[in-house]
Protein backbone atom coordinates (compact mmCIF):
# COMPACT_ATOMS: atom_id res chain seq x y z
CA UNK A 1 0.00 0.00 0.00
CA UNK A 2 1.13 3.54 -0.70
CA UNK A 3 0.75 6.54 1.55
CA UNK A 4 -1.39 9.18 -0.13
CA UNK A 5 -1.17 11.96 2.40
CA UNK A 6 -2.68 14.96 0.64
CA UNK A 7 -4.81 15.97 2.31
CA UNK A 8 -5.15 13.91 5.46
CA UNK A 9 -7.39 16.15 7.55
CA UNK A 10 -11.02 16.87 6.79
CA UNK A 11 -13.57 18.91 8.71
CA UNK A 12 -13.27 16.73 11.82
CA UNK A 13 -9.83 15.16 11.88
CA UNK A 14 -8.95 12.23 9.64
CA UNK A 15 -11.62 9.80 8.53
CA UNK A 16 -12.09 7.01 6.01
CA UNK A 17 -12.69 3.35 5.43
CA UNK A 18 -10.41 1.13 7.52
CA UNK A 19 -7.47 -0.30 5.54
CA UNK A 20 -7.97 2.25 2.78
CA UNK A 21 -6.01 5.48 2.65
CA UNK A 22 -5.77 7.55 4.69
CA UNK A 23 -6.95 5.10 7.36
CA UNK A 24 -4.18 2.53 7.06
CA UNK A 25 -1.78 1.19 9.66
CA UNK A 26 1.16 2.53 7.66
CA UNK A 27 -0.19 6.08 7.62
CA UNK A 28 -1.17 5.83 11.28
CA UNK A 29 2.41 4.98 12.28
CA UNK A 30 3.60 8.02 10.34
CA UNK A 31 0.89 10.12 11.96
CA UNK A 32 2.10 9.06 15.40
CA UNK A 33 5.63 10.06 14.44
CA UNK A 34 4.41 13.40 13.09
CA UNK A 35 2.43 14.24 16.24
CA UNK A 36 5.58 13.45 18.21
CA UNK A 37 7.64 15.57 15.83
CA UNK A 38 5.37 18.59 16.35
CA UNK A 39 5.62 18.22 20.13
CA UNK A 40 9.41 17.88 20.01
CA UNK A 41 9.70 20.96 17.80
CA UNK A 42 8.11 22.98 20.58
CA UNK A 43 10.52 21.74 23.21
CA UNK A 44 12.73 18.72 23.74
CA UNK A 45 12.33 16.44 26.70
CA UNK A 46 9.59 14.11 27.84
CA UNK A 47 6.06 14.31 26.45
CA UNK A 48 2.87 12.39 27.20
CA UNK A 49 0.00 11.64 24.83
CA UNK A 50 -3.28 9.97 25.81
CA UNK A 51 -4.96 7.64 23.30
CA UNK A 52 -8.62 6.62 23.43
CA UNK A 53 -10.91 4.83 21.00
CA UNK A 54 -14.48 3.77 20.36
CA UNK A 55 -15.65 0.17 19.91
CA UNK A 56 -14.84 -0.45 16.23
CA UNK A 57 -12.96 -3.64 15.45
CA UNK A 58 -10.33 -1.67 13.53
CA UNK A 59 -9.63 0.44 16.61
CA UNK A 60 -7.18 -2.14 17.89
CA UNK A 61 -4.84 -1.90 14.92
CA UNK A 62 -4.94 1.90 14.77
CA UNK A 63 -4.34 2.13 18.51
CA UNK A 64 -1.23 -0.04 18.18
CA UNK A 65 -0.01 1.78 15.08
CA UNK A 66 -0.33 5.25 16.59
CA UNK A 67 1.32 4.17 19.83
CA UNK A 68 4.16 2.55 17.85
CA UNK A 69 4.79 5.79 15.98
CA UNK A 70 4.64 7.92 19.12
CA UNK A 71 6.82 5.71 21.31
CA UNK A 72 9.39 5.29 18.53
CA UNK A 73 9.96 9.04 18.87
CA UNK A 74 10.36 8.90 22.65
CA UNK A 75 6.80 9.85 23.61
CA UNK A 76 5.14 8.25 26.64
CA UNK A 77 1.63 7.09 25.75
CA UNK A 78 -1.32 6.52 28.06
CA UNK A 79 -3.84 4.05 26.64
CA UNK A 80 -7.41 4.74 27.77
CA UNK A 81 -9.32 2.02 25.93
CA UNK A 82 -12.96 2.60 24.87
CA UNK A 83 -14.06 6.03 26.08
CA UNK A 84 -16.17 8.87 24.59
CA UNK A 85 -14.41 11.60 22.63
CA UNK A 86 -15.15 14.21 25.35
CA UNK A 87 -13.52 11.82 27.81
CA UNK A 88 -10.27 12.04 25.86
CA UNK A 89 -10.47 15.84 25.89
CA UNK A 90 -11.09 15.81 29.65
CA UNK A 91 -8.34 13.31 30.50
CA UNK A 92 -5.84 15.14 28.30
CA UNK A 93 -6.31 18.13 30.59
CA UNK A 94 -6.60 16.12 33.81
CA UNK A 95 -3.34 14.25 33.17
CA UNK A 96 -1.55 17.41 32.00
CA UNK A 97 -0.78 15.53 28.78
CA UNK A 98 0.77 17.27 25.80
CA UNK A 99 -1.85 15.92 23.40
CA UNK A 100 -4.80 13.56 23.18
CA UNK A 101 -5.84 11.28 20.33
CA UNK A 102 -9.29 9.76 19.80
CA UNK A 103 -9.68 6.88 17.35
CA UNK A 104 -13.25 7.08 16.07
CA UNK A 105 -15.35 7.78 13.00
CA UNK A 106 -18.11 9.19 15.20
CA UNK A 107 -21.53 8.47 13.65
CA UNK A 108 -20.15 6.62 10.60
CA UNK A 109 -20.66 2.86 10.13
CA UNK A 110 -18.21 0.38 11.67
CA UNK A 111 -16.23 -0.13 8.44
CA UNK A 112 -14.95 3.44 8.77
CA UNK A 113 -12.58 4.83 11.34
CA UNK A 114 -10.97 8.15 12.08
CA UNK A 115 -8.53 10.08 14.23
CA UNK A 116 -9.14 13.29 16.16
CA UNK A 117 -6.25 15.10 17.83
CA UNK A 118 -6.49 17.37 20.86
CA UNK A 119 -3.90 19.84 22.12
CA UNK A 120 -2.88 20.03 25.77
CA UNK A 121 -5.78 22.37 26.59
CA UNK A 122 -8.35 19.82 25.39
CA UNK A 123 -9.31 21.71 22.23
CA UNK A 124 -9.00 20.08 18.82
CA UNK A 125 -5.82 21.12 17.02
CA UNK A 126 -6.06 23.98 14.54
CA UNK A 127 -5.40 24.07 10.83
CA UNK A 128 -1.81 25.27 11.20
CA UNK A 129 -0.89 22.23 13.30
CA UNK A 130 -2.73 19.92 10.89
CA UNK A 131 -0.75 21.36 7.99
CA UNK A 132 2.53 20.89 9.88
CA UNK A 133 1.64 17.25 10.55
CA UNK A 134 0.79 16.71 6.89
CA UNK A 135 4.07 18.30 5.81
CA UNK A 136 6.06 16.02 8.11
CA UNK A 137 4.31 12.93 6.78
CA UNK A 138 4.80 14.03 3.17
CA UNK A 139 8.53 14.54 3.72
CA UNK A 140 8.87 11.69 6.24
CA UNK A 141 11.05 14.05 8.23
CA UNK A 142 10.19 13.81 11.91
CA UNK A 143 13.50 14.62 13.58
CA UNK A 144 16.05 12.24 15.03
CA UNK A 145 15.03 8.90 16.52
CA UNK A 146 15.87 8.32 20.18
CA UNK A 147 18.16 5.48 21.15
CA UNK A 148 18.29 2.88 23.89
CA UNK A 149 16.47 3.95 27.05
CA UNK A 150 15.16 7.14 25.40
CA UNK A 151 12.39 5.40 23.44
CA UNK A 152 8.90 5.89 24.81
CA UNK A 153 6.81 3.48 26.83
CA UNK A 154 3.11 2.74 26.85
CA UNK A 155 0.91 2.48 29.93
CA UNK A 156 -2.72 1.47 30.26
CA UNK A 157 -4.77 3.86 32.39
CA UNK A 158 -6.94 1.52 34.43
CA UNK A 159 -9.28 4.14 35.90
CA UNK A 160 -9.90 6.28 32.79
CA UNK A 161 -13.61 5.46 32.66
CA UNK A 162 -14.00 6.05 36.39
CA UNK A 163 -12.36 9.46 36.16
CA UNK A 164 -14.65 10.49 33.32
CA UNK A 165 -17.73 9.17 35.13
CA UNK A 166 -16.89 11.27 38.20
CA UNK A 167 -16.21 14.32 36.03
CA UNK A 168 -19.58 13.96 34.27
CA UNK A 169 -21.45 13.53 37.56
CA UNK A 170 -19.74 16.64 38.94
CA UNK A 171 -21.54 18.74 36.30
CA UNK A 172 -24.83 17.83 38.01
CA UNK A 173 -25.72 19.87 41.13
CA UNK A 174 -24.53 18.47 44.44
CA UNK A 175 -27.39 17.30 46.61
CA UNK A 176 -29.62 16.53 43.63
CA UNK A 177 -30.26 13.09 42.17
CA UNK A 178 -32.19 11.56 39.29
CA UNK A 179 -34.27 9.45 41.66
CA UNK A 180 -37.72 8.77 40.30
CA UNK A 181 -36.71 9.22 36.64
CA UNK A 182 -36.99 6.28 34.28
CA UNK A 183 -34.57 6.78 31.39
CA UNK A 184 -34.28 4.83 28.14
CA UNK A 185 -30.63 5.08 27.08
CA UNK A 186 -29.21 4.15 23.65
CA UNK A 187 -25.40 4.18 23.46
CA UNK A 188 -25.19 3.11 19.78
CA UNK A 189 -22.98 0.14 20.77
CA UNK A 190 -20.29 2.79 20.95
CA UNK A 191 -17.72 4.38 23.21
CA UNK A 192 -20.23 5.35 25.92
CA UNK A 193 -21.64 1.84 26.39
CA UNK A 194 -20.20 1.46 29.90
CA UNK A 195 -19.73 5.08 30.94
CA UNK A 196 -23.21 6.46 30.23
CA UNK A 197 -25.26 3.82 32.11
CA UNK A 198 -22.95 4.22 35.11
CA UNK A 199 -23.34 8.01 35.19
CA UNK A 200 -27.14 7.93 35.21
CA UNK A 201 -27.43 4.91 37.50
CA UNK A 202 -25.01 6.36 40.05
CA UNK A 203 -27.21 9.47 40.13
CA UNK A 204 -30.07 7.12 41.08
CA UNK A 205 -32.04 7.00 37.82
CA UNK A 206 -33.72 3.84 36.61
CA UNK A 207 -31.93 3.11 33.33
CA UNK A 208 -33.19 0.87 30.53
CA UNK A 209 -30.26 0.24 28.18
CA UNK A 210 -30.21 -0.20 24.43
CA UNK A 211 -27.13 -0.25 22.20
CA UNK A 212 -24.83 -1.29 25.03
CA UNK A 213 -23.51 -4.56 23.58
CA UNK A 214 -20.73 -3.68 21.12
CA UNK A 215 -19.42 -6.45 18.89
CA UNK A 216 -16.87 -4.33 17.05
CA UNK A 217 -19.07 -4.43 13.97
CA UNK A 218 -22.39 -2.97 15.17
CA UNK A 219 -21.56 0.60 16.20
CA UNK A 220 -24.28 3.03 14.99
CA UNK A 221 -26.05 0.16 13.21
CA UNK A 222 -29.74 1.05 13.35
CA UNK A 223 -29.31 2.63 16.77
CA UNK A 224 -28.07 5.70 18.61
CA UNK A 225 -28.50 9.37 17.78
CA UNK A 226 -28.96 8.69 14.07
CA UNK A 227 -31.82 6.26 14.76
CA UNK A 228 -33.93 7.81 17.54
CA UNK A 229 -36.94 5.75 16.43
CA UNK A 230 -35.53 2.97 18.64
CA UNK A 231 -35.92 4.97 21.83
CA UNK A 232 -39.14 6.59 20.63
CA UNK A 233 -40.78 3.16 20.74
CA UNK A 234 -38.95 2.14 23.92
CA UNK A 235 -40.00 5.25 25.85
CA UNK A 236 -43.66 4.49 25.15
CA UNK A 237 -43.25 0.76 25.79
CA UNK A 238 -41.52 1.27 29.15
CA UNK A 239 -43.55 4.36 30.13
CA UNK A 240 -40.27 6.19 30.60
CA UNK A 241 -39.84 9.85 31.48
CA UNK A 242 -37.24 10.51 28.81
CA UNK A 243 -35.10 8.88 26.14
CA UNK A 244 -31.42 9.63 25.56
CA UNK A 245 -29.60 8.63 22.35
CA UNK A 246 -25.85 9.09 21.88
CA UNK A 247 -23.73 8.49 18.79
CA UNK A 248 -20.75 6.17 18.40
CA UNK A 249 -18.21 8.41 20.12
CA UNK A 250 -20.58 10.01 22.61
CA UNK A 251 -20.33 13.63 21.51
CA UNK A 252 -23.87 13.91 20.11
CA UNK A 253 -27.19 13.87 21.94
CA UNK A 254 -30.75 13.43 20.72
CA UNK A 255 -33.56 13.10 23.28
CA UNK A 256 -37.14 11.84 23.24
CA UNK A 257 -39.86 13.21 25.50
CA UNK A 258 -42.30 11.14 27.54
CA UNK A 259 -44.79 11.22 24.67
CA UNK A 260 -42.30 9.69 22.23
CA UNK A 261 -41.51 12.92 20.37
CA UNK A 262 -37.95 13.58 19.17
CA UNK A 263 -36.19 16.57 20.72
CA UNK A 264 -33.27 17.41 18.45
CA UNK A 265 -30.18 19.52 19.01
CA UNK A 266 -31.93 22.76 18.03
CA UNK A 267 -34.57 22.31 20.71
CA UNK A 268 -32.09 21.12 23.34
CA UNK A 269 -30.00 24.23 22.66
CA UNK A 270 -33.11 26.37 23.16
CA UNK A 271 -33.99 24.67 26.46
CA UNK A 272 -30.49 25.16 27.85
CA UNK A 273 -30.12 28.72 26.56
CA UNK A 274 -33.46 29.71 28.10
CA UNK A 275 -32.43 28.22 31.45
CA UNK A 276 -29.04 29.96 31.45
CA UNK A 277 -30.65 33.31 30.64
CA UNK A 278 -33.22 32.86 33.39
CA UNK A 279 -30.41 32.24 35.86
CA UNK A 280 -28.45 35.22 34.49
CA UNK A 281 -25.64 32.84 33.58
CA UNK A 282 -25.54 33.47 29.82
CA UNK A 283 -22.82 36.03 29.01
CA UNK A 284 -24.18 38.82 26.81
CA UNK A 285 -27.28 36.63 26.35
CA UNK A 286 -25.54 34.99 23.40
CA UNK A 287 -25.44 31.47 21.97
CA UNK A 288 -23.97 30.00 18.79
CA UNK A 289 -26.09 27.97 16.35
CA UNK A 290 -25.53 26.93 12.72
CA UNK A 291 -26.94 27.58 9.26
CA UNK A 292 -29.00 24.40 9.70
CA UNK A 293 -30.77 25.69 12.80
CA UNK A 294 -34.53 25.79 12.33
CA UNK A 295 -36.02 29.27 11.77
CA UNK A 296 -38.69 28.59 14.38
CA UNK A 297 -36.00 27.91 16.96
CA UNK A 298 -34.19 31.12 16.02
CA UNK A 299 -37.43 33.08 16.39
CA UNK A 300 -38.01 31.52 19.81
CA UNK A 301 -34.52 32.40 21.04
CA UNK A 302 -34.82 35.95 19.74
CA UNK A 303 -38.20 36.32 21.48
CA UNK A 304 -36.39 35.60 24.76
CA UNK A 305 -33.86 38.33 24.07
CA UNK A 306 -31.11 35.85 23.25
CA UNK A 307 -28.66 36.84 20.54
CA UNK A 308 -27.76 34.04 18.12
CA UNK A 309 -24.45 33.93 16.26
CA UNK A 310 -24.68 31.71 13.18
CA UNK A 311 -21.74 29.48 12.22
CA UNK A 312 -21.16 26.94 9.45
CA UNK A 313 -22.11 23.35 10.24
CA UNK A 314 -19.69 21.35 12.37
CA UNK A 315 -18.72 21.47 16.03
CA UNK A 316 -15.32 22.87 15.08
CA UNK A 317 -16.95 25.94 13.53
CA UNK A 318 -19.41 26.25 16.41
CA UNK A 319 -16.53 26.24 18.89
CA UNK A 320 -14.56 28.80 16.88
CA UNK A 321 -17.51 31.20 16.90
CA UNK A 322 -18.06 30.59 20.61
CA UNK A 323 -14.48 31.55 21.38
CA UNK A 324 -14.69 34.62 19.13
CA UNK A 325 -17.92 35.87 20.73
CA UNK A 326 -17.15 34.66 24.28
CA UNK A 327 -20.28 32.49 24.25
CA UNK A 328 -20.41 29.57 26.70
CA UNK A 329 -23.12 27.60 24.89
CA UNK A 330 -23.33 26.46 21.30
CA UNK A 331 -24.81 23.61 19.36
CA UNK A 332 -26.24 22.23 16.18
CA UNK A 333 -29.32 20.37 15.04
CA UNK A 334 -27.47 17.04 14.80
CA UNK A 335 -26.95 17.01 18.55
CA UNK A 336 -23.52 18.45 19.19
CA UNK A 337 -23.77 20.71 22.26
CA UNK A 338 -20.79 22.50 23.74
CA UNK A 339 -20.89 23.82 27.30
CA UNK A 340 -17.59 25.64 27.67
CA UNK A 341 -18.10 25.85 31.43
CA UNK A 342 -17.68 22.06 31.49
CA UNK A 343 -15.73 20.80 28.49
CA UNK A 344 -13.89 21.85 25.36
CA UNK A 345 -15.89 19.76 22.90
CA UNK A 346 -19.37 18.32 22.42
CA UNK A 347 -20.39 15.98 25.24
CA UNK A 348 -23.62 13.99 24.94
CA UNK A 349 -23.67 12.75 28.54
CA UNK A 350 -23.00 16.15 30.10
CA UNK A 351 -25.55 17.79 27.78
CA UNK A 352 -28.18 15.24 28.82
CA UNK A 353 -27.45 15.91 32.49
CA UNK A 354 -28.05 19.64 31.98
CA UNK A 355 -31.44 18.98 30.38
CA UNK A 356 -32.38 16.54 33.16
CA UNK A 357 -31.37 19.14 35.76
CA UNK A 358 -33.67 21.69 34.14
CA UNK A 359 -36.54 19.18 34.13
CA UNK A 360 -36.06 18.45 37.83
CA UNK A 361 -35.56 22.04 38.98
CA UNK A 362 -38.54 23.31 37.01
CA UNK A 363 -40.68 20.27 37.88
CA UNK A 364 -41.42 19.94 34.18
CA UNK A 365 -41.57 17.11 31.68
CA UNK A 366 -39.44 17.36 28.56
CA UNK A 367 -42.57 17.99 26.51
CA UNK A 368 -43.42 20.91 28.84
CA UNK A 369 -40.01 22.45 28.11
CA UNK A 370 -40.51 22.25 24.34
CA UNK A 371 -44.19 23.24 24.24
CA UNK A 372 -43.52 26.90 23.44
CA UNK A 373 -41.01 26.17 20.65
CA UNK A 374 -42.77 26.10 17.28
CA UNK A 375 -40.45 24.77 14.59
CA UNK A 376 -40.83 25.68 10.94
CA UNK A 377 -41.53 22.77 8.57
CA UNK A 378 -38.17 21.46 7.40
CA UNK A 379 -37.10 18.54 5.22
CA UNK A 380 -33.55 17.16 5.37
CA UNK A 381 -32.49 14.37 3.01
CA UNK A 382 -29.04 12.80 2.71
CA UNK A 383 -28.09 11.79 -0.82
CA UNK A 384 -25.19 9.31 -1.25
CA UNK A 385 -22.90 10.56 -4.01
CA UNK A 386 -20.16 8.89 -6.03
CA UNK A 387 -17.89 11.91 -5.62
CA UNK A 388 -18.05 15.51 -4.48
CA UNK A 389 -18.24 17.63 -7.60
CA UNK A 390 -18.46 21.40 -6.95
CA UNK A 391 -22.19 22.05 -6.74
CA UNK A 392 -22.02 25.33 -8.63
CA UNK A 393 -20.62 23.43 -11.63
CA UNK A 394 -23.74 21.27 -11.94
CA UNK A 395 -26.00 23.25 -14.26
CA UNK A 396 -29.12 21.09 -13.80
CA UNK A 397 -28.78 21.34 -10.02
CA UNK A 398 -28.45 25.11 -10.21
CA UNK A 399 -31.54 25.34 -12.41
CA UNK A 400 -33.72 23.36 -10.00
CA UNK A 401 -32.38 25.34 -7.03
CA UNK A 402 -33.40 28.58 -8.71
CA UNK A 403 -36.86 27.19 -9.48
CA UNK A 404 -37.39 26.09 -5.88
CA UNK A 405 -36.16 29.44 -4.54
CA UNK A 406 -38.73 31.24 -6.68
CA UNK A 407 -41.50 28.98 -5.35
CA UNK A 408 -40.49 29.51 -1.72
CA UNK A 409 -39.93 33.25 -2.07
CA UNK A 410 -39.12 35.04 1.18
CA UNK A 411 -40.99 32.46 3.27
CA UNK A 412 -38.42 29.69 2.99
CA UNK A 413 -34.86 28.72 2.24
CA UNK A 414 -32.69 25.98 0.71
CA UNK A 415 -29.37 24.65 1.93
CA UNK A 416 -27.35 22.29 -0.24
CA UNK A 417 -23.98 21.11 1.08
CA UNK A 418 -21.66 18.14 1.17
CA UNK A 419 -20.98 16.31 4.42
CA UNK A 420 -17.47 16.92 5.69
CA UNK A 421 -17.11 13.32 6.86
CA UNK A 422 -19.01 11.16 4.35
CA UNK A 423 -19.71 11.05 0.60
CA UNK A 424 -23.16 12.53 1.13
CA UNK A 425 -24.90 15.62 -0.21
CA UNK A 426 -27.34 17.10 2.31
CA UNK A 427 -30.49 18.69 0.92
CA UNK A 428 -32.45 20.90 3.31
CA UNK A 429 -35.60 22.82 2.44
CA UNK A 430 -37.50 24.94 4.97
CA UNK A 431 -40.77 26.80 4.53
CA UNK A 432 -44.25 27.30 5.94
CA UNK A 433 -46.04 24.16 4.68
CA UNK A 434 -44.79 20.66 5.45
CA UNK A 435 -46.17 19.00 2.32
CA UNK A 436 -44.59 21.70 0.16
CA UNK A 437 -41.09 21.49 1.66
CA UNK A 438 -41.15 17.68 1.43
CA UNK A 439 -42.15 17.83 -2.22
CA UNK A 440 -39.59 20.50 -3.11
CA UNK A 441 -36.81 18.66 -1.27
CA UNK A 442 -37.64 15.49 -3.22
CA UNK A 443 -37.50 17.47 -6.47
CA UNK A 444 -33.97 18.66 -5.66
CA UNK A 445 -32.90 15.18 -4.51
CA UNK A 446 -34.01 13.63 -7.81
CA UNK A 447 -31.80 16.02 -9.77
CA UNK A 448 -28.81 15.59 -7.45
CA UNK A 449 -29.12 11.79 -7.71
CA UNK A 450 -29.29 11.97 -11.49
CA UNK A 451 -26.19 14.17 -11.65
CA UNK A 452 -23.83 12.70 -9.04
CA UNK A 453 -25.68 9.97 -7.16
CA UNK A 454 -23.90 6.73 -6.35
CA UNK A 455 -23.24 4.07 -3.75
CA UNK A 456 -22.34 5.55 -0.37
CA UNK A 457 -18.57 5.63 0.06
CA UNK A 458 -17.35 7.12 3.32
CA UNK A 459 -14.41 9.42 3.09
Swiss-Prot record:
Extract the PROSITE patterns matched here: PGM_PMM
Q: Which cofactor does it need?
A: Mg(2+)
* Paired cysteines (S-S): none
Q: Which residues form the active site?
A: 106 (phosphoserine intermediate)
Keywords, ordered alphabetically: Isomerase, Magnesium, Metal-binding, Phosphoprotein
- The answer on whether this UniProt entry bears the keyword Cell inner membrane reads no
Q: Name one GO biological process term.
A: UDP-N-acetylglucosamine biosynthetic process
Any one of the GO CC terms: cytosol
Q: Which residues carry the post-translational modification Phosphoserine, per the record?
A: 106
Please name the GO terms that the record assigns under molecular function.
magnesium ion binding; phosphoglucosamine mutase activity; phosphomannomutase activity
Q: Which residues bind Mg(2+)?
A: 106, 247, 249, 251
Q: What is catalyzed by this enzyme?
A: alpha-D-glucosamine 1-phosphate = D-glucosamine 6-phosphate
Q: How is it modified after translation?
A: Activated by phosphorylation.
One Pfam family hit: PGM_PMM_IV
Q: What is its EC number?
A: 5.4.2.10
Q: What does the entry comment about cofactor binding?
A: Binds 1 Mg(2+) ion per subunit.
User: What top-level branch of life does the organism fall under?
Assistant: Bacteria
Q: Which InterPro entries match?
A: A-D-PHexomutase_a/b/a-I (IPR005844), A-D-PHexomutase_a/b/a-I/II/III (IPR016055), A-D-PHexomutase_a/b/a-II (IPR005845), A-D-PHexomutase_a/b/a-III (IPR005846), A-D-PHexomutase_C (IPR005843), A-D-PHexomutase_C_sf (IPR036900), A-D-PHexomutase_CS (IPR016066), Alpha-D-phosphohexomutase_SF (IPR005841)
Its function? Catalyzes the conversion of glucosamine-6-phosphate to glucosamine-1-phosphate.
Question: Which family is it part of?
Answer: Belongs to the phosphohexose mutase family.
Q: Which PANTHER family match?
A: PHOSPHOGLUCOMUTASE (ALPHA-D-GLUCOSE-1,6-BISPHOSPHATE-DEPENDENT), PHOSPHOHEXOSE MUTASE
Q: What is this protein called?
A: Phosphoglucosamine mutase
What is the organism of origin for this protein?
A: Chlamydia muridarum (strain MoPn / Nigg)
Amino acid sequence: MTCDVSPLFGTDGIRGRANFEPMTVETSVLLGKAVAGVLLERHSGKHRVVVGKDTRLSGYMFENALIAGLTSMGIETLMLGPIPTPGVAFITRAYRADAGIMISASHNPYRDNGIKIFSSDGFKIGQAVEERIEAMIASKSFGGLPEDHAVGKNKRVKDAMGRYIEYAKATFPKGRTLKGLRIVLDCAHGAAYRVAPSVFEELDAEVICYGCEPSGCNINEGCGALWPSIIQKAVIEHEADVGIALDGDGDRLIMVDEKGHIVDGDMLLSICASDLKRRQALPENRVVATVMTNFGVLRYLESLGIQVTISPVGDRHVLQHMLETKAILGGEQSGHMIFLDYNTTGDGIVSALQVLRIMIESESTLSDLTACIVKSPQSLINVPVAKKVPLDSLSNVQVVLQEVKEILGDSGRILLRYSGTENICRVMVEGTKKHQVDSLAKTIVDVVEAEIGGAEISE
